[in-house]
Amino acid sequence: MKIIAKKDLFINDEIRVREVRLVGLEGEQLGIKPLSEAQAIADAANVDLVLIQPQAVPPVAKIMDYGKFKFEFQKKQKEQRKKQSVVTVKEVRLSPVIDKGDFETKLRNGRKFLEKGNKVKVSIRFKGRMITHKEIGAKVLAEFAEATQDIAIIEQRAKMDGRQMFMQLAPISDKK
């Protein structure tokens, strides 16, 4: 199991260099020491010798409790994953000739998505000759944006993509 992504840490007998720049338990510099002496110091303190900078000249080794270090590192990564929020984009599909009741239902769903912290893509699909009346679709999108302006901001203005017009809304708390 790797604990640090792109590089492996060498510990104790895995270290294959002649001398190291030694860092103590509390982070103090102990100077450049032969590997055997550095391992003896680590053994005397009953902890591990970990090569933390193998590309440095001379390589940097630190005296530390490797098990504790690994545990703390994994704990820190777990906390970072918890804090990371996944933003999903939900879609609400409308029609240029949508009825008031249907519009209210779609609006309610869009508001629910926004309150949960999701972004909302509002799209209108033009069928047949409706494509000639793009202003009707733009009016419906503007009405939707106006009805959600208290909890959302327009992240992407209304634009055409083939036979579809869409805009994207983001929750206000997301932008603070």
UniProtKB/Swiss-Prot annotation:
Keywords: Cytoplasm, Initiation factor, Protein biosynthesis. GO terms for cellular component: cytosol; membrane. The keyword DNA-binding does not apply. It is found in: Cytoplasm. GO terms for molecular function: ribosome binding; translation initiation factor activity. HAMAP family: IF_3. PANTHER family: TRANSLATION INITIATION FACTOR IF-3, TRANSLATION INITIATION FACTOR IF-3, MITOCHONDRIAL. IF-3 binds to the 30S ribosomal subunit and shifts the equilibrium between 70S ribosomes and their 50S and 30S subunits in favor of the free subunits, thus enhancing the availability of 30S subunits on which protein synthesis initiation begins. Belongs to the IF-3 family. This is Translation initiation factor IF-3.
